[in-house]
């Protein structure tokens, strides 16, 4: 009788021990899976996510290095969308430059000067990229793993290429300001049409269509650059 009771008691302890070890194992796995907060390079204080201060240590106020995982849309406080409020984008750009521009770090350590240069370059690149519809669209595609190498005629049909050639010929032959303005108006209207259609393609998640339209838009952007150069006095 005693032997049966001992075996029963031993079984209870085994169940309890297994449960205890299981909880310990789950706890250690959760701790291992939890990401470790980055530390300030200057004071070693943990930089907590979501603390509201993206660029400076909340403890010692030292400028921190740029976050390599952050995309341009996040940096500039924009939704990851082809449709961007350019006025808000400009305000964000000015705000960031007041925070990280190298002129404000001339008396700081070499490390902070270096980080300031990195931040300022990143902010400039983000602003220029998101400001223009073409570069914004190409960047959105890049975030999807899709790139259009320069000089690619992706789905540019012969009729479209003839249209581009004719506009370039008109531009080369333009002898008056009125002729130049007519070409410029044509190009501006085409770019507006492309912008609207590209926005629709991204909203529908049709990245192939967006890629096709952005390829064509790049041709007209090149013509726009030629028009600007023709207006620049020598």
Swiss-Prot record:
GO biological process: [2Fe-2S] cluster assembly; primitive erythrocyte differentiation; primitive hemopoiesis; protein complex oligomerization
Domain J: 71-143
Gene Ontology CC terms: mitochondrion
InterPro entries: HscB, HscB_4_cys, HscB_C_sf, HscB_oligo_C, J_dom_sf
Pfam families per record: HscB_4_cys, HSCB_C
UniProt keywords, alphabetically: Chaperone, Cytoplasm, Metal-binding, Mitochondrion
Consequences of knocking out this gene: Knockout of the gene is embryonic lethal. Specific loss of the gene in erythroblasts is also lethal due to anemia.
A GO term, aspect molecular function: protein-folding chaperone binding
Binding site for a divalent metal cation: 40, 43, 57, 60
Pathway listed: Cofactor biosynthesis; iron-sulfur cluster biosynthesis
Family per similarity comment: Belongs to the HscB family.
PANTHER family in the record: IRON-SULFUR CLUSTER CO-CHAPERONE PROTEIN HSCB
Protein name: Iron-sulfur cluster co-chaperone protein HscB
The organism's taxonomic lineage, starting at the top: Eukaryota, Metazoa, Chordata, Craniata, Vertebrata
């Amino acid at each position: 009788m005693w032997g049966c009771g001992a075996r029963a008691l031993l079984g209870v302890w085994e169940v309890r021990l297994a449960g205890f070890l299981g909880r310990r194992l789950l706890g250690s796995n959760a701790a291992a899976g939890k990401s470790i907060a980055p530390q300030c390079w200057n004071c070693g204080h943990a930089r907590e996510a979501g603390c509201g201060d993206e660029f400076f240590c909340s403890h010692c106020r030292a400028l921190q290095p740029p976050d390599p995982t952050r995309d341009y849309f996040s940096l500039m406080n924009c939704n990851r969308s082809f449709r961007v409020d350019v006025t808000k984008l400009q305000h964000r750009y000015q705000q960031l430059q007041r925070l990280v521009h190298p002129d404000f770090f001339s008396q700081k350590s070499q490390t902070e000067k270096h980080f300031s240069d990195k931040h300022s370059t990143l902010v400039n690149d983000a602003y220029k990229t998101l400001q223009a519809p073409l570069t914004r669209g190409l960047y959105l595609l890049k975030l999807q793993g899709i790139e259009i190498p320069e000089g690619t005629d992706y789905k540019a049909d012969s009729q479209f290429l003839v249209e581009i050639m004719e506009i370039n010929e008109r531009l080369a032959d333009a002898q008056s300001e009125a002729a130049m303005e007519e070409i410029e108006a044509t190009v501006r209207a085409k770019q507006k049409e492309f912008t609207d259609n590209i926005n629709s393609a991204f909203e529908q998640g049709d990245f192939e269509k967006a890629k096709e339209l952005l390829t064509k838009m790049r041709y007209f952007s090149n013509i726009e650059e030629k028009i600007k150069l023709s207006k620049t006095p020598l």
